[in-house]
Amino acid sequence: PEVKIGVVAVSRDCFPESLSVNRRKALMKAYTEKYGADSVYECPVCIVESEIHMVQALEDIKKAGCNALCVYLGNFGPEISETLLAKHFDGPAMFIAAAEETQNDLVGGRGDAYCGMLNASYNLKLRNIKAYIPENPVGTAAECADMLHEFIPIARAIVGLSDLKIISFGPRPLNFLACNAPIKQLYLSLIHISEPTRHAQ
């Protein structure tokens, strides 16, 4: 399947929203210059400690036809809103964060996204939300662009598996699931399993 990743930036009201927005723009610029714009969509909504913003962002990326999500911490993000976005989005999600570009502006230019990334991963676990986090999820715009591109085959596999239906060979009674196959992980991946019965046409 084709994958289109919606990139949503998040922020806190104790940090400049513009910092997160500008870092999102830098990420998108770095990505499109290296990989093109076909597989990504820049969501104009920046989530700033608001579940209203979260709903707006969710509706926007759905309307844009996105089937994968990237939550981008341009600075210290809001744990509740950003993780709820991943929860309510019907598709694979990843989390990455912006590194500090310089040490010269630690008042208006300090985002502390590294700390926000730690809190995000903790809150994802608390809510039992599955999301992809790269091994080194904090980086420059160029590094985050590479992470975003590396997420595409992962997202494609998840999207493809979510629509998969396995028809195995019987015959067995209708709706009969035995313990002779490791099917739990398939069910957790939202894969349906069916067996044709002796009564099937």
Residue ranges and their predicted role:
Residues V7, P153-N180, K184:
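Conserved anion/nucleotide-ligand pocket segment
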Residues R12-L27, V107-Y114, L174-N180:
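Glycine- and acidic-residue-enriched helix-capping/strand-helix junction motifs
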Residues M28-I47, K130-N136, S194:
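Short beta-strand elements in bilobed, periplasmic/extracellular small-molecule ligand-binding domains
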Residues I47-S162, L174:
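Cofactor- and metal-binding active-site motifs of prokaryotic enzymes
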Residues I191-Q201:
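Single conserved hydrophobic/aromatic residue that forms the stacking wall/gate
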